[in-house]
């Protein structure tokens, strides 16, 4: 659906190459080689998908790219959100793990999006979000300090990607994720039991 010029552009080609390498284990050297679909050799869990979405390009660590500006990886300057879903027969129990800025710099926070979106992160109604998906209003891209997402974007934009503290920060991110994820399985089990009697 894209012309060859766009498919071959480094900013598009590199992130596809990185993702397909993580999914298939193979390195594709041309945009024309990328498969349209594959049968995975294993089941991908939440952590596998998060790992793919957090991928950086070796070109991103080139000298001078202090603030992750080149963006040849999957996690790039224009990635302001990233979501991984775990589907369930009952839509109320669909789980989401969401970052509010670059996934390589911020934690995935667990939530149940169809149970009720967290008011702190939902600045559009479902209807507005669906309508704006392909026809967004210009003001949706304007800086608004009252939108919680901007606190995360401000932080991501101030992280010096080349600084040694970047790796330390990511250890903190993983530690926070572990803490946030700890009660999930027990909470889900309890919620499903309660749903049987409600």
Where are these regions (language model features)?
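C-terminus-biased signal that marks the final domain/tail of proteins
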Residues: 1-198
